[in-house]
Regions:
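Charge-biased low-complexity segments
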Residues: 22-265
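Bacterial Sec-dependent N-terminal signal peptides
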Residues: 1-31
Length: 265
């Protein structure tokens, strides 16, 4: 089943890649283009007109709306949960607008958010979204300080990510580790069984919560070694990769979920 899943994922990515518009075909400022465009969309732009119609219905239903967006491969804000939490307290409805990777000629995506944003700015001013995002970020920072918020390593800029301490020096982490097992593992060319291990880099640079996130045997006969290989992977990380310079978010020390892929030979 996992082989089928990864094959499907690869095909999906390639399909999306084929359908993405070249950069030079995009408007110079998509945000401002949409704000102007929704006021007078092309009559044949069914996608945009449907989005505008839905936005108008939601504006009748909810007094205040904050629109989030999501798409395959899009980066999520580290304080996305706090936006929802803050918005609920302020009686602001959070609605997620999902963008498809498929581009249809003459059809425009993003009109729903543009329409809602325009209306909210008319009522609350140009900084409507900024105020919500700033409040949510401050809420997240408070959680970071108390240790109740764990950020992903991918939420941080490169200079703020945890750095591995080796021989009393800070080094960049190796994304893929290799363990020589001595076991009769089945493999093909450079394809070996692997396991994705996650762990938390604490504020004091130690690690905790080491766990298996994903196991790929490569071949059925390797399944019987799963528990043994998982133990080897965790032991290697706990032994050789347990000292870190902790991560930071805007100069605030934070707990960070990090990860390694461990391959077995």
């Amino acid at each position: 089943m996992k082989t089928i899943y990864y094959l499907f994922l690869l095909l999906f990515l390639l399909d999306c890649k084929d359908k993405v518009k070249p950069v030079d075909e995009q408007p110079p400022n998509p945000k401002e283009f949409l704000r102007s465009y929704v006021k007078n969309p092309n009559p044949n732009d069914r996608m945009c007109k449907d989005d505008i119609e839905q936005a108008e219905k939601d504006l009748e239903k909810y007094k205040n709306i904050y629109v989030t967006t999501s798409c395959f491969g899009c980066k999520t804000s580290p304080y996305a949960d706090e936006i929802i939490e803050y918005a609920a307290k302020q009686k602001i409805e959070v609605i997620n607008d999902i963008y498809s990777c498929v581009v249809m000629e003459g059809q425009t995506k993003g009109c729903y958010k543009a329409m809602i944003d325009l209306k909210m700015e008319e009522i609350h001013g140009k900084d409507f979204r900024h105020k919500i995002e700033h409040a949510a970020e401050q809420l997240m920072i408070q959680k970071i300080k108390t240790g109740t918020k764990i950020l992903s390593v991918y939420d941080l800029s490169e200079e703020d990510q945890p750095n591995l301490v080796k021989e009393n020096k800070f080094t960049r982490k190796e994304d893929i580790l290799t363990v020589q097992t001595g076991l009769p593992l089945q493999h093909e060319l450079d394809t070996y069984p692997f396991i994705d291990i996650s762990f938390i880099v604490e504020k004091d640079g130690t690690i905790s919560n080491v766990k298996n996130e994903n196991w790929v045997s490569g071949f059925k006969r390797n399944e019987k070694y799963k528990n043994e290989l998982e133990g080897l992977a965790k032991n290697k990380i706990l032994t050789n990769y347990s000292k870190w310079k902790p991560g930071k978010y805007k100069n605030t020390l934070t707990r960070v979920e990090n990860n390694f892929r461990v391959c077995f030979k």
